[in-house]
């Protein structure tokens, strides 16, 4: 690491606009209805494939940028054939190492997100990104930088793979604990005079549709609110504090959620994510946006929210989700979704077990999530130093590189 930083001090660097050294190409429109089942990922406006097709329109290594939606501007790197849809690809010329370009784009991911335009469905355009200037050292130096940064990302990938394995174990036991078969058995053992009820969400709670909140309304302080997009990117399973605030005037017009309400995002790029929820456990009443619902029940909210994560619930979502580019699910459909409902005492016990699983999952194998975060921060730190050509960069805290 010291050698490469010394090299960068005297490196001759040329700055060029991306449009001068890269070719930007839009994808081809396709809908899930028109796709033919296959194993080629269709890359659109999300962070992962929208669905799969039987043919590709990009071969080899491809850098893509999501063109529209909540994740417009998201940068991806593909080493397999893909079908590029609602996104654009970036192909560098011979002056640029493709992997170097990818790391540089990641370094500027927040700037790319800031290119979003549109009040409805936001878009990011290649013509705007093409104006960004990129530092171009020699190809030899680019390769050395890539080698260093890839070591960080490979290690993070290994840690994430191990964490994913633990997550699969958790998912298995969660689905088993919340299965109708298991709940029927346990309910019978606990209370001979009670049966497991299969009920609809509408029978045990009430959905309230959100309204009116836009990100442009956000303030640094004021009345607490949650926007549907934040459920995907900012919040976990539960939340007791918000990240955004609005004025008294805006807040007075919003639907409100109370402690133990479940907040459900009902618009997404894909059917897997639509319906993602967060349990509000804060003491304050909060406002919430359109494209989401609150769900209020006298049952254990966390029990119901855990059930929202199961494969059984996912199948119900798939039957009712609508849309192609933007997937939606409606409150009147969710009211009809079925859920196995044991006595409240058993709900509480199951939640207690699953909460412990969650803690173990986040604390497993030498505090994996914390180590992943630490390595990711290391990667971001040295990416900043290596790709902005900061000659004063630190040479400390580099281990096992």
Q: What do the PLM-derived regions correspond to, one by one?
A:
Residues 1-401:
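Charged, alpha-helix-forming regions
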């Amino acid at each position: 690491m010291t050698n490469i930083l010394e090299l960068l001090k005297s490196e001759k660097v040329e700055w060029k606009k991306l449009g001068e050294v890269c070719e930007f190409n839009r994808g081809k429109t396709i809908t899930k209805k028109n796709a033919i089942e296959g194993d080629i990922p269709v890359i659109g406006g999300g962070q992962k494939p929208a669905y799969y097709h039987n043919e590709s329109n990009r071969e080899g290594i491809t850098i893509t940028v999501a063109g529209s939606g909540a994740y417009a501007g998201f940068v991806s790197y593909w080493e397999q054939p893909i079908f590029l849809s609602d996104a654009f690809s970036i192909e560098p010329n011979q002056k640029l190492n493709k992997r170097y370009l990818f790391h540089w784009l990641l370094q500027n991911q927040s700037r790319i997100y800031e290119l979003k335009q549109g009040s409805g469905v936001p878009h990011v355009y290649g013509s705007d990104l093409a104006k960004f200037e990129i530092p171009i050292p020699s190809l030899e130096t680019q390769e050395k930088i890539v080698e260093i940064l890839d070591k960080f990302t490979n290690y993070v990938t290994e840690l994430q793979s191990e964490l994913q394995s633990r997550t699969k174990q958790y998912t298995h036991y969660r689905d088993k604990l919340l299965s109708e078969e298991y709940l029927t058995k346990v309910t019978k053992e606990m209370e001979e005079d009670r049966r497991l009820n299969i009920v609809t969400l509408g029978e045990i709670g009430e959905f309230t549709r959100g309204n009116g909140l836009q990100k442009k309304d956000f303030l640094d302080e004021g009345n607490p609110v949650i926007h549907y997009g934040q459920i995907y990117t900012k919040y976990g399973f539960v939340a007791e504090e918000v990240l955004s605030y609005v004025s008294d005037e805006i807040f007075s017009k919003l639907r409100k959620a109370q402690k133990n309400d479940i907040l459900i995002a009902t618009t997404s790029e894909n059917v897997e994510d639509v319906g993602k929820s967060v349990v509000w456990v804060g003491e304050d009443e909060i406002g919430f946006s359109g494209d989401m619902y609150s769900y209020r029940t006298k049952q254990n909210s966390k029990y119901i929210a855990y059930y929202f994560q199961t494969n059984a619930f996912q199948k119900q979502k798939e039957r009712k989700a609508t849309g192609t580019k933007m997937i939606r699910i409606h409150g009147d459909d969710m009211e009809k979704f079925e859920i196995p409902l044991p006595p409240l005492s058993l709900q509480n016990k199951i939640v207690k077990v699953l909460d412990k699983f969650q803690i173990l999952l986040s604390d497993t194998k030498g505090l994996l999530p914390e180590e992943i975060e630490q390595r990711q921060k290391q990667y971001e730190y040295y990416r900043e130093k290596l790709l902005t050509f900061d000659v004063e960069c630190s040479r400390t805290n580099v281990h096992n590189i």
